[in-house]
Amino acid sequence: MLHTMIQKACKKWFSSDECKIKNLISYMISTGELRDAQIEAIKTYLFLKIACDNKPLYELFCNGAFNSLSEEELNSMELSTLTREILLTNKAALALYEYASQKNEKGEQVSVKLTDEIKKNPQNINYETIFKKIFYGVTYSDYLFSLPMGAGKTFLMAAFIYIDLYFAMQNPDDSRFARNFIILAPSGLKTSVIPSLRTIQEFNPAWVLPEPTASEIKRQMIFEVLDENKSAKKSNRTKNPNVQKLALHQPFEDLTGLVAVTNAEKVILDGLVRAEQGELFEESSETKDREANELRYWIGKLPQLSVFIDEVHHATDGDIKLRSVVNRW
């Protein structure tokens, strides 16, 4: 239901004069190559990037970016003076109240318990902390796009990559848009890397960008598969062959258009263990873990990096470790 609030705000923005991507979306629709679900995902993606400045979701909810309840609507509700005052002055409180008040597809309220608590004790609730917990304490932009089976999730990632590069090349100093990309294929699927890369390589950017821009951007793309298992022979730079592939693209300052694909397991340390306090830390001297650490370090050096995790639900118990790795980047 949080998604419902985002979509409502997105539609309002898209129909306003502030939205400058209408022609771009119209072009995508005119090509007839993208499914409706993909178009809607792209609209939402650009709304979060442009209108919302690519800020973390918890911050956007706390700032009332998706609030739609008006003062008139609040005044018509049975609320105490204190509750109404807090909802009118605290955007995070209003966001949480609006979320809990929504109805699902069955007509059931999302959380009667939560709205009742806000009505009874609005001054005792730490609204910002609640939103941080909802979004797992993530303090960077982290968006999940869930499409139906067969709706083209990998193509959608490719579309996002080209769209980011399009805006990044227009405004190199705009940090909202990525210049380089790492795609983490499911660690549980050993043969998923090559198909993922091939799908992205074969994606026709003219589906989302007009020519000659589409072809110009594609010519600047660099694709790397980081799937080597064995250490390379002695080298002055590194013993990890996957790191060698990245090192060839130095200096990184002006690097733009790199798309690297690897299995999630390549960057997850088996030696990541949980301390009593709940934190993950490294406790291993295994070669595999040293190589994973080295690869993570070099990936983290890539400028304006966007991380795509493909079907992360396949990672099972590895998803917690993977989140820890992404947090460090």
Predicted regions and their residues:
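RecA-like P-loop NTPase motor core of helicase/translocase proteins
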Residues: 1-329
